[in-house]
């Protein structure tokens, strides 16, 4: 058995550690990135933490350009993995999927392939490119598992669990995400700044009463009491799982909400207003061409540097309302992750941890034959039970909280 992991950023760091802790099932591990030194640094951390469960299995680093399909195919054929885990940014999904198809090797990723905030991109079309591989993967005899992070990912499994065990009829699904931790910086992003800044400035899309609704970013807000984290303001955002849930789970409204503090939004609004969040090329007075967003990324702290000293909890979950046995029911299925616990385990913070742990939990379902049908699947389509039985042993527990049924108070902001 063997896996090939592509990507050595924050999520890749956690994925590699968790793969190493479970290499008795996953087998040999190869970590590949454009910068092989980043892979080697992860391997050093794994060895430092004694996280390689079976020392007889390989743990190696390789260099690869994830945009180059031919190079990817060559690496896959060299490594001969049973599964390729894509821990890279969303824009490499399609090249890696194509390489897996050509090499006839199964595939897993943690986010949708498109930037949901780019001009003209809309949530209703978010998965079109990747869903186009359904028949190809089935004919090739391989498995594709899409969006196996936390959100998307675990929140979709929570929704599937609610459908299977807790409800007869679903009215609303609200994905709730807040980071109540403190990294001690005035402003920083918890994962790749480019991805993060693009994600939170785009219009929000949500599903309501049989149609898609589109509103400006940060224009819909509600306050929610998060278990162990207290009350936080959360804002409606475009997000991957809204599309996949709408495809596979009948509900009257489906929406994603993320928490932002007032200070964070103040910094964000200033940077957006002066053009620092633009990905478009800009020519300076000396002829140098730069992208403002790339300049900002270079100025901000590396997300991997935030882990030491990061304190506090995250809370991410799926709030489902509907009916069971003819009675109204409201439940919040959630996880709390602790930044300090994550650092002690894998030398990283809880944001990356909550993405990396589910990816390996899903990979284990594939290797154990629980999630190994041929074709391309989103997490809502797969049996939630074996995944949720496994996830606590990999590092993330989960809970079901009963709430008082009732429609959330959504504030419409200017």
UniProtKB/Swiss-Prot annotation:
Q: Which organism is it from?
A: Vibrio alginolyticus (strain ATCC 17749 / DSM 2171 / NBRC 15630 / NCIMB 1903 / NCTC 12160 / XII-53)
> What does the subunit comment say?
Homodimer.
> Could you say how this protein's activity is regulated?
Activated by dithiothreitol and inhibited by SH-reactive compounds.
Going by the record, the broad EC class of this enzyme is oxidoreductase
Protein function: Involved in norspermidine biosynthesis. Catalyzes the synthesis of carboxynorspermidine from L-aspartate 4-semialdehyde and 1,3-diaminopropane. Is also slightly active with putrescine as a substrate.
Q: According to its UniProt record, which protein family does this protein belong to? A: Belongs to the saccharopine dehydrogenase family. Carboxynorspermidine synthase subfamily.
Name of this chain's protein: Carboxynorspermidine synthase
- Write down the EC number: 1.5.1.43
